Amino acid sequence: MFTLDSFRKDRTQHRQRQCKLPPPRLPPMCVNPAPGGTISRASRDLLKEFPQPKNLLNSVIGRALGISHAKDKLVYVHTNGPKKKKVTLHIKWPKSVEVEGYGSKKIDAERQAAAAACQLFKGWGLLGPRNELFDAAKYRVLADRFGSPADSWWRPEPTMPPTSWRQLNPENIRPAGTGGLSRSLGREEEEDEEEELEEGTIDVTEFLSMTQQDSHNPLRDSRGGSFEMTDDDSAIRALTQFPLPKNLLAKVIQIATSSSTAKNLMQFHTVGTKTKLATLTLLWPCPMTFVAKGRRKAEAENKAAALACKKLKSLGLVDRNNEPLTHAMYNLASLRELGETQRRPCTIQVPEPILRKIEAFLSHYPVDSSWISPELRLQSDDILPLGKDSGPLSDPITGKPYMPLSEAEEVRLSQSLLELWRRRGPIWQEAPQLPVDPHRDTILSAIEQHPVVVISGDTGCGKTTRIPQLLLERYVTEGRGARCNVIITQPRRISAVSVAQRVSHELGPSLRRNVGFQVRLESKPPARGGALLFCTVGILLRKLQSNPSLEGVSHVIVDEVHERDVNTDFLLILLKGLQRLNPALRLVLMSATGDNERFSRYFGGCPVIKVPGFMYPVKEHYLEDILAKLGKHQYPHRHRHHESEDECALDLDLVTDLVLHIDARGEPGGILCFLPGWQEIKGVQQRLQEALGMHESKYLILPVHSNIPMMDQKAIFQQPPLGVRKIVLATNIAETSITVNDIVHVVDSGLHKEERYDLKTKVSCLETVWVSRANVIQRRGRAGRCQSGFAYHLFPRSRLEKMVPFQVPEILRTPLENLVLQAKIHMPEKTAVEFLSKAVDSPNIKAVDEAVILLQEIGVLDQREYLTTLGQRLAHISTDPRLAKAIVLAAIFRCLHPLLVVVSCLTRDPFSSSLQNRAEVDKVKALLSHDSGSDHLAFVRAVAGWEEVLRWQDRTSRENYLEENLLYAPSLRFIHGLIKQFSENIYEAFLVGKPSDCTLPSAQCNEYSEEEELVKGVLMAGLYPNLIQVRQGKVTRQGKFKPNSVTYRTKSGNILLHKSTINREATRLRSRWLTYFMAVKSNGSVFVRDSSQVHPLAVLLLTDGDVHIRDDGRRATISLSDSDLLRLEGDSRTVRLLRELRRALGRMVERSLRSELAALPLSVQQEHGQLLALLAELLRGPCGSFDVRKTADD
């Protein structure tokens, strides 16, 4: 049986062999022919083992070096014999080696040589036991061991000439049989996926900048043709300098002309009997003839070809290493021409009637010195008081205004609680005894005597459900129940709700109203006094804004603190500082696993109470055991977890097979399957449904993910009917807090999604990585909570030893903008670095500074790190700062409802996408977007259609709409809840008169909601500087110039459009500018998944910052001062009017932010209405000369 240990043993042997490689230059490895020229048995065996040897060699080298073609690394040299053909294969990677092959035909000889090379590669460890390829990362390691690292980023040689071969001939030579340069550049070959992912692909202007820096020796000119016949000694010297001249000539011509053959451009004519005279006619780069002699035809031709190579080198068409230049360098003139076109500003064309309207408006409402300039806009003085001190304290338990109980009320309520407690009946006695119960006195005494206590309890000890009840019992039975108001945080919504329901059930009907929960979009708070409130960490953070000292709260219990999510670490900073403001408050940290002593030290050496848990026996199976059970004797191809965490992969078929095997042969009971993410959950669910077919009714397949609304997730706790097996497919959301009682089998993929932030590229990457050993323990424990169980780990035992003990805290690996904004809301007097340095694990100072700079860049913080007027508004809106900014601007620009939909859909995808139907979803999005060029407006139309069918109250119509548009009803319900929540936030931020206005078409805040270009422009203004400029032409890492391809340039560098955005496949873009919300890093490249084309005038008029103008009195250019992505040109009058219009819009925004929007004077509202009408009309106009054409294969 093939096991991981045997695989590693083989790999070690491979590495030992490759460490003992012979010197760089080896003698040819010969595959000897059989008598008569037939293929020998040994050769047939080789070809049987390597049936496609040439493709295999290309694939190995291509993957290792990250190139799509390996022509330069594999050179076949042919020699004609009397009865057989001989091929010498020159291999240039990983070492310079020659391999020979023979055959009756040239192709047979090539295949034999290639097969021999494959055998050599396998012996070096470059192929797996079954001749399979390795991943690129491993090849890089192998190459380093060879002392021949993979090619680095391509740069022009210092001697490469800064010109094009077209300049060699003033007549612009077009060789016979080709269409010349223009034809070759117009024909773009189809790009494969690997090339599309190349990190090194750059745009034309960047390449030209590099070329100017690195290139010093221009191409020498060659006017007209030439005829060269030299003495034989010169030809021999040339042949010594160029030992494979024909191959070099062919490569040069093929690269320069983008052709697959050089036959038409290099022609030999050989005459003579004893002495052969070879004439080489070279039609590129201009007609040239070379003559040489030799005893054999091949010798004469090689000498002539060597003379040609020498000539090309003198012209600068071959580099100093006698290798061809790149395609881009041969076509530098065209590159420069295209680069010059790209650098030109785009012409502004504003119709004369609109210009007159702008002049009239500015004449009536001049932008004078009374307007606050953009520089002053960053100051936070004299703003509308919208912060946490602007209103009465809020009761953290009920959410109502807080008023302390009088002494009489407290006594009365305490007595009432005591009576209710005594009337509970036998329910408490019926509750199962849990491991935490015998430790009740120790726990309660510690909490009473110490402000902070850490409770470390194993899985199943009952700390989550029982300790809040123990606290309540102690207070109630001592006659002070009214003083007991406990807030218990949970890391996830489903945990908060399910635990609250469990505790409510255990307390019984008489005290049920004293237990409640509050999560996003769903709330059922308890009555005040003797209250247990279960909520998410984010909810408690919001409560701290309106009650900074948590007055009215007796205890805060932070459960699952070991998970170290970013909100929990942030909460601990606040709670640590809160001890000085509210010394009576008791803090309890509860952890299942983790470094609990670290929490103790953080809170000054507070006590740690360890509670042993109880688990039923759990039998564990690892991958090698599982494969044996399934009758698989080797690793499935898609389930080879590589050593690099970046390349963890999961075979969904293996997961499905295992679940079916457990169902067929395992013990009765539920199956809980831990999967990395939503795509994997949907993939396994679809496979199970297909496999079960007509028997699906005997199974309850339940996905559990944060994408699913609470009402749909509650089904996992329900007992299935007799004869029905429950199969739960979950992320790590099911690892802690919640208990599904009938789970007997746990399938652990060993993987989860983890967000990581790249400081260099400033993008996040949601990676699939190995879990920690603590996660494995937690997952295993789900099978032994209520009965004996089984755990199936889809990784080898040896992998467990390599897993890290605990997860890296989220605060150390995620973007910090949201955290910094929260810090400014809670403690505005502290700098971000100062505040976050108080975390259990302080984040990188550079990461904090980057977050501060971004918030300053989007106008949320001023230079002193105080909240600006805009920041004060954003503080009320619970979403990403950039999305919150877009919402605020949408209220001001009166297009609010579509922006609420967009922001909600960026929070929760409305489409029912999976690994199998991505292409179909992309087609639906393209249809929904119409001709708007916007993924975001596709969201708006999808939700609008759903709201329309809901009004019909026709179930069939609703189901048809969902099916036709591949929409997911639970996500749409969640989006509806988000829109409602954001509406409340906007009302709290004084941006609308009442929450219902936000979705009312006739409300003033939605006056321009139908203006698509304005909606996209406002979204762009919120997301700025997330702006893309589309540029024509690119140069690949291999130096291939592709004039009909496009690159996507941002302020930070080049990015790629993901296939999921409709603009990726668009054959024509109406605008060169796109906006986007989020970029993610994958496989070394940065991708954008959502995008919208935006009008260039929207970019000019609606972005923050200054503009720069160059005006000669007749024509003027205007550009963004902080970016080179936008340069527009027009007549001086047009540019001047647009600049003043931009200032008028800035004044409107500033006025709106400095007072309650609905309370602005009527005259000001009318002025703003006229300005917005003018803006909408301007953006309705054509983009003029901003069209960009793309080839279909881009």
UniProtKB/Swiss-Prot annotation:
SUPFAM superfamilies: P-loop containing nucleoside triphosphate hydrolases (SSF52540). Residues 1-10 have a biased composition (Basic and acidic residues). The modification Phosphoserine is found at residues 6, 226, 380. It is found in: Cytoplasm; Mitochondrion; Mitochondrion matrix, Mitochondrion nucleoid. CDD domains: DEXHc_DHX30, SF2_C_RHA. Residues 1-27, 153-200 are annotated as: Disordered. Residues 654-827 form the Helicase C-terminal domain. It comes from the Eukaryota. PROSITE patterns: DEAH_ATP_HELICASE, HELICASE_ATP_BIND_1, HELICASE_CTER. Pfam families: DEAD, DSRM_2, HA2_C, Helicase_C, OB_NTP_bind. The keyword RNA-binding applies. A motif (DEAH box) lies at residues 559-562. It is an enzyme of class 3 (hydrolase). The keyword Signal does not apply. GO terms for biological process: central nervous system development; mitochondrial large ribosomal subunit assembly. ATP binds at residues 457-464. Residues 53-121 form the DRBM domain. Its EC number is 3.6.4.13. Belongs to the DEAD box helicase family. DEAH subfamily. RNA-dependent helicase. Plays an important role in the assembly of the mitochondrial large ribosomal subunit. Associates with mitochondrial DNA. Required for optimal function of the zinc-finger antiviral protein ZC3HAV1. Involved in nervous system development and differentiation through its involvement in the up-regulation of a number of genes which are required for neurogenesis, including GSC, NCAM1, neurogenin, and NEUROD. This is ATP-dependent RNA helicase DHX30. The lineage of its organism: Eukaryota, Metazoa, Chordata, Craniata, Vertebrata.
